[in-house]
Amino acid sequence: MTIGTITSQVNYRAALNTLWASLMLEELVRMGVKQICIAPGSRSTSLTLAAVANNKLTIHTHFDERGLGFLALGIAKASQEPVAVVVTSGTAVANLLPAVAEAGLTGEKLVLLTSDRPVELIQCGANQAIVQHDIFSQHVTAFHDIPSPTLDISPAWLLSTIDEAMQLQQRQGRAIHFNCHYPEPLYGDDVDFSEYLAPVSEWKGDELPYVSHQQALAPHIAIDKRQWQSLTQRKGVVIVGRLAPEELGQVTLLAEKLGWPLLLDPQAGGSSAWAGFDVWLQNASCQAFLQQADTVIQFGARIVSKRLLQFIATSSIEHYWLIDPRAGRLDSTHRRSSRIQAPIGEWATCALSLTENSEHAGWAMPLQVVSERYFEMLGEYSDQLTELSLAVNLGAWLPDKTELFLGNSLIIRLLDMVGKLPSTATFANRGASGIDGLIATIAGINKARQAPMVGLLGDTSLLYDLNSLALLRDVSQPVVIIVTNNDGGGIFDLLPVPALQRDELYRMPHGLEFSHAAAMFGLAYYCPESLPQAEEQCLYALTQPKTTIIEIKTPAGEAGEMIKALFGKVKNATLL
């Protein structure tokens, strides 16, 4: 059909909208997108119908765009693949910002396909029209404003624009944003566009991207053998932040070969014989002992422990190496350092092959004894059901291959202070470290991993993302949400906020519990009254292919008082 014949048809614009959407999605598929998250909307009809027509895409839906963004974030986090997101125009787009900001800091690859009014309807009083141009600003790796589909622009431009942004994302990570202007009509019959598509006929006949990018040099791990072997003869520490699943094993082997202490953040996916360092580093003798180290090798970023960050910032470190696959600055202490961008597991394996016996192997073994004595002290906190006893005991409750999601605010800090976590895939949103979107993120991880999962979060976090429980109604593996309900923001009990305004303006007690929320979404619910009962209910829930909420109710302020008492005891104890 000729272009003149096409434009004479009443609804050709609707068909052209869908054609452009189909071209975009097909090229995204060829560039590695397998899953797409869609919220309802009329302006996004072309993208939605194109997704349905593409049998290489798995579709996930949610009625709330903020939750949808975090759902996609969870899928991308767990699969380590790009995930597409489709929303309609207006504030639907703005609701993606929290998830986009998180991905901007932690590197998950989101492909945002936002629908927009045509440019002539922006800032003129038209309905559901806001300024969406570059709305995510510096939080995204690339932004492209896709004009209203027109036969005057070759489909080759559209495909090559997709390829350019996706190639940039492959190198830098984070979200990329295509803002797509769709004029009405949005609904119509198919039209023959064969003449218009002639310039990309070869592309249509294969399954390759329109533009194939190749690096001149294949990426490889390069470590200066002489420099590394000199470094390994020092007193060093191996610090581990956020890791991808299955990377901890290689890092642990390297630390063992070096004979250096291994300090693991909760996001690392396990614990070591030096666990509890966030607390025992408050003991002056222990702190002084660790400060003998003049070398730090850090794998992964986003460290939770303030005490560990203070050690990095203030100790007399001569050599600080930070290895992470993501680009950008990841050292908030601004130390002079060697910043290595590389896959962590591969780099650790390469370093291990170059590592000889270290002169100072085992130098920090006394700190293992410190850790043992510290955990003996925690025994007195294990007889009652409290947030502290939950954090102390949780690791022992989890069957093999049960994965973890750790919420923000108080709970992840408690696990860092007193927990011993099992070796398992462990996830968290520790970029912006917000309490929003945690349930939706858990749902996304669950969809990608298809493994039993326990998510731990606080009551305010659950209230913040309550409607995302809808995403957990239909699961194929056990999902257990353990919510610690201390009636508000318990983290503020540990911060020097004004005492007179602590409740009213910081903790904000709500007086709510979650049994009715569980019932509303058809989820199982337990509220244990003792620590053994909590363990029993958790273990049972992990045998059921459904979602269970376990609510741990504790008095407001209790956790803060217990932590302060523990800190005082450890500071004054003889641990070395």
Swiss-Prot record:
Its EC number is 2.2.1.9. It is an enzyme of class 2 (transferase). InterPro entries: DHS-like_NAD/FAD-binding_dom (IPR029035), MenaQ_synth_MenD (IPR004433), MenD_middle (IPR032264), THDP-binding (IPR029061), Thiamin_PyroP_enz_TPP-bd_dom (IPR012001). Pfam families: TPP_enzyme_M_2 (PF16582), TPP_enzyme_N (PF02776). GO terms for molecular function: 2-succinyl-5-enolpyruvyl-6-hydroxy-3-cyclohexene-1-carboxylic-acid synthase activity; magnesium ion binding; manganese ion binding; thiamine pyrophosphate binding. Keywords: Magnesium, Manganese, Menaquinone biosynthesis, Metal-binding, Thiamine pyrophosphate, Transferase. Binds 1 thiamine pyrophosphate per subunit. Its cofactor is Mg(2+); Mn(2+); thiamine diphosphate. The keyword Acetylation does not apply. It catalyses: isochorismate + 2-oxoglutarate + H(+) = 5-enolpyruvoyl-6-hydroxy-2-succinyl-cyclohex-3-ene-1-carboxylate + CO2. NCBIfam families: menD. Homodimer. Belongs to the TPP enzyme family. MenD subfamily. HAMAP family: MenD (MF_01659). Catalyzes the thiamine diphosphate-dependent decarboxylation of 2-oxoglutarate and the subsequent addition of the resulting succinic semialdehyde-thiamine pyrophosphate anion to isochorismate to yield 2-succinyl-5-enolpyruvyl-6-hydroxy-3-cyclohexene-1-carboxylate (SEPHCHC). This is 2-succinyl-5-enolpyruvyl-6-hydroxy-3-cyclohexene-1-carboxylate synthase. The gene is menD.
